[in-house]
Amino acid sequence: MASIKPLGDRVVVEPKNESEEKIGSIIVPDTAKEKPQEGKVIAAGQGRYEDGKLVPLEVKVGDTVLYGKYSGTEIKQGGKDLLIIRESDILGVVTN
């Protein structure tokens, strides 16, 4: 399986899995569920250039991040749903 190496200030995020939701005995279909806004960074680019200097990303592989509801580009890789987003679309890093 090929891996994805994001360019520039982009990161690849694996959205947090939503468990199957039931209301009473009714199963809520995937199309009616809200998209998760939390995920794990699985790949990161080298950073962005400002004034000719490389500025490294603030997030790193393994970080759990929060991002905007409509951020990024959805892709499928190896049967997984992934999201490629810019670092500027990341709202914060979840810490324990």
UniProtKB/Swiss-Prot annotation:
UniProt GO MF annotations: ATP binding; metal ion binding; protein folding chaperone; protein-folding chaperone binding; unfolded protein binding
InterPro entries for this protein: Chaperonin_GroES, Chaperonin_GroES_sf, Chaprnonin_Cpn10_CS, GroES-like_sf
GO cellular component: cytoplasm
CDD domains: cpn10 (cd00320)
Superkingdom in the source lineage: Bacteria
Compartment(s): Cytoplasm
SMART domains: Cpn10
Any one Gene Ontology BP term: chaperone cofactor-dependent protein refolding
Keywords, ordered alphabetically: Chaperone, Cytoplasm
Pfam families, per database record: Cpn10
PANTHER family, per database record: 10 KDA HEAT SHOCK PROTEIN, CO-CHAPERONIN GROES
HAMAP family: CH10
Assembly and interaction partners: Heptamer of 7 subunits arranged in a ring. Interacts with the chaperonin GroEL.
NCBIfam families found in the cross-reference section: PRK00364.2-2 (NF001531), PRK00364.2-4 (NF001533)
Task of the protein: Together with the chaperonin GroEL, plays an essential role in assisting protein folding. The GroEL-GroES system forms a nano-cage that allows encapsulation of the non-native substrate proteins and provides a physical environment optimized to promote and accelerate protein folding. GroES binds to the apical surface of the GroEL ring, thereby capping the opening of the GroEL channel.
Family indicated by similarity: Belongs to the GroES chaperonin family.
Identification of the protein by name: Co-chaperonin GroES
Organism of provenance: Leptospira biflexa serovar Patoc (strain Patoc 1 / ATCC 23582 / Paris)
Source species taxonomy: Bacteria, Pseudomonadati, Spirochaetota, Spirochaetia, Leptospirales
Gene from which this protein is expressed: groES
